[in-house]
UniProtKB/Swiss-Prot annotation:
Residues 127-160 form a coiled coil. This is Mitochondrial translation release factor in rescue. A motif (GGQ) lies at residues 71-73. It comes from Homo sapiens (Human). Part of a mitoribosome-associated quality control pathway that prevents aberrant translation by responding to interruptions during elongation. As heterodimer with MTRES1, ejects the unfinished nascent chain and peptidyl transfer RNA (tRNA), respectively, from stalled ribosomes. Recruitment of mitoribosome biogenesis factors to these quality control intermediates suggests additional roles for MTRES1 and MTRF during mitoribosome rescue. The modification N5-methylglutamine is found at Q73. GO terms for molecular function: ribosomal large subunit binding; translation release factor activity, codon specific; tRNA binding. Its main location: mitochondrion. It is found in: Mitochondrion. The GGQ domain interacts with the peptidyltransferase center (PTC) of the large ribosomal subunit to trigger nascent chain hydrolysis. Interacts (via C-terminus) with MTRES1 (via S4 domain). Associates with mitoribosomal S39 large subunit, peptidyl tRNA and nascent chain. SUPFAM superfamilies: Release factor (SSF75620).
Length: 166
């Protein structure tokens, strides 16, 4: 038998691209699995709550400061970091999640709206309710994992004891 036959592949070894060339990484992820792919911009506002208190632009104080963090000179020299203050409550939000000032302004307003709603409504706020539900789900998952671990230990003990008998 020759060595050529051992290395014969039925299909060419080429990379198959799942999406057209011009798409960015998060767009490719969205095409592959639309429910899973989340960009950092979408993560900032977390969810869109229609029942939140509305913000009055007259009660807001907005500043643009220089950025920080990874990105080097392009990030550190431009003033695209938004500092938004709600004057009546004194809540301050700093947003520097994107390089765009407009996107940072929108994100800062969403985050401030959530924080102001929690400040005034407390435990009745939809944001606070969601946090409680998430904590409850986490606790349930932890409890199930602990029960599963105990069952596995018991099964292992039974298996080892039956092994010693034979």
């Amino acid at each position: 038998m020759s060595t050529v036959g051992l290395f014969h592949f039925p299909t060419p070894l080429t990379r198959i691209c799942p999406a057209p060339w011009g798409l960015r990484l998060w767009e490719k992820l969205t095409l592959l699995s639309p429910g899973i792919a989340v960009t950092p911009v979408q993560m900032a506002g977390k969810k869109d709550y229609p029942a939140l208190l509305s913000l009055d632009e007259n009660e807001l104080e907005e500043q643009f400061v220089k950025g920080h963090g990874p990105g080097g000179q392009a990030t550190n020299k431009t003033s695209n970091c938004v500092v938004l203050k709600h004057i009546p409550s004194g809540i301050v939000v700093k947003c520097h999640q994107t390089r765009s000032v407009d996107q940072n302004r929108k994100l800062a307003r969403k985050i401030l709206q959530e924080k102001v709603d929690v400040f005034y409504n407390g435990e009745n706020s939809p944001v606070h309710k969601e946090k409680r539900e998430a904590a409850k789900k986490k606790q349930e998952r932890k409890k199930r994992a602990k029960e599963t671990l105990e069952k596995k230990k018991l099964l292992k003990e039974l298996w080892e004891s039956s092994k010693k008998v034979h």
